[in-house]
Amino acid sequence: MTSRRDFLKKSGLAMAGLSLLNRSPLHSAIGAAAQTAGDLMSKRPPLDKRKFVSEAVDEEIRRVQGDIGNRDLAWIFGNCYPNTLDTTVQFAMIDGRPDTFVITGDIDAMWLRDSSAQVWPYLPLVTQDPKLKELIAGVINRQTKCILLDPYANAFNYGPTGSPFDKDLTTMKPGIHERKWEVDSLCYPIRLAHRYWKETGDTSPFDGKWRDAMKLVVKTFRQQQRKDGRGPYKFQRVTAVQTDTVAGGGYGNPIKPVGMIVSIFRPSDDSTIFPFLVPSNLFAVHVLKLLAEMSRDIMKDEKFAGDCSSLADEVYEAVQRFAVVNHETFGDMYAYEVDGYGDHSFMDDANAPSLLSLPYLDCVPESDQVYQNTRQFLFSGSNPYYFKGAAGDGIGSAHTGLGKIWPIAIMMRAFTSRNDNEISRCLSTLVESSAGTGFMHESFDENDPKKFTRSWFAWANTLFGELIIRLQKEKPYLLS
């Protein structure tokens, strides 16, 4: 059976570090030989080859680059920030409504998580660019269709074109690319919809179909609290990769129904060990509150708003009771996964939602002591997925194996830090990790950034752009 890892390898794009390096004019990280931004050839597609052109985004690139004193950093920012628009979006008007399909980059399919995160950094510009606003409205409309097709699926095709995972032992409908149940897949579209509404005041995407999709989200969350049995979802795959299939006959390892929501897979698309995935549950708490607000103000549905709020409260209380665990060194901290019986895992995974990313996603305050204790743990030898080598240090993922650091986790470290030295180290490592390609990657070897995975990973690229824009606003002196 084809796994996602095999799918990437067969596409010839998973490990393209050396070939890209040889084509790149950049062979250094921060502090190396001086080169002007003009010396470094843009890695963007030619104007007529770009999937979408936004004057507001291009102007933002010029504005921010003008404040970046480090030339390498300015060059990478100029390549990365527009990468989603340049290379991954397919816009159309369907039945008189905008529709935007967003691929991840090297995989020709749309993940609910990735697509939401990929366009998120452009939201501050939508009032300046009506076409950009329409594009993101199209993402919301497409996500609505996806959720209504199957709320348990994580990734979708543009149409009923078939999938390399058609033989998975689960209910694969036409149009589904992969059917891995991940709580965050239903959280990200709510986060995107709420921010779009707040930025624009536009409620046109939030029609009857969107409302049906949101009610299906809450229904699915309640099903996966498993108070009345295991629910309708199960998944197995014939594979040599343990994390691509599911224990317990496809239902996951046993849980005690304590109020949290089961997530059979992590945001990395790897199966969970203990099915209550803590960062995803806290993300669900946050977005359920956002959905309650939208229900009251847009849908005028107090009953559904109350349902969202009560579910958020129930999940939050369960997290505080069953997922805050005392560590002998770091004190009370969040476990990564729990089962309600007292079993837990102390670790983190690079993909967001992660424990590290909780303040970035507005799930917990940065000052929260339990979070701060957790954060200290994450960057210690006690975290089995914290790696440190000649090329830098950071959090990795079981998805890519030991010794592989993820740039997304380095960005989350910078987003959640107020320490200038820590942020500067993150920027240095990110530039180093680019390995002369001008782009971010999925992961890189702790000792050799030229050994990286996924040369075209749009979420990481656009997130890097978001980080630089935030620093330009809040700490511009770090970009010199």
Please give the residue ranges for each predicted region.
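Twin-arginine (Tat) signal peptide motif
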Residues: 1-8
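N-terminal export signals
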Residues: 8-32
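Low-complexity, Ser/Thr/Pro/Gly-enriched N-terminal "stalk/linker" regions
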Residues: 35-113
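Well-ordered alpha-helical scaffold segments within catalytic/enzyme domains
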Residues: 56-69, 117-130, 188-203, 282-300, ...
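Extended, well-ordered alpha-helical scaffold segments
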Residues: 76, 130-146, 202-222, 291-294, ...
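Aromatic-rich carbohydrate-recognition surfaces in CAZymes
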Residues: 108-136, 140-243, 458-472
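Extended ligand-binding clefts on enzyme/binding-domain cores
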Residues: 112, 148-152, 159, 165-174, ...
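C-terminal capping/lid segments that line or modulate ligand- or cofactor-binding pockets
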Residues: 167-174, 179-182, 345-365, 403-480
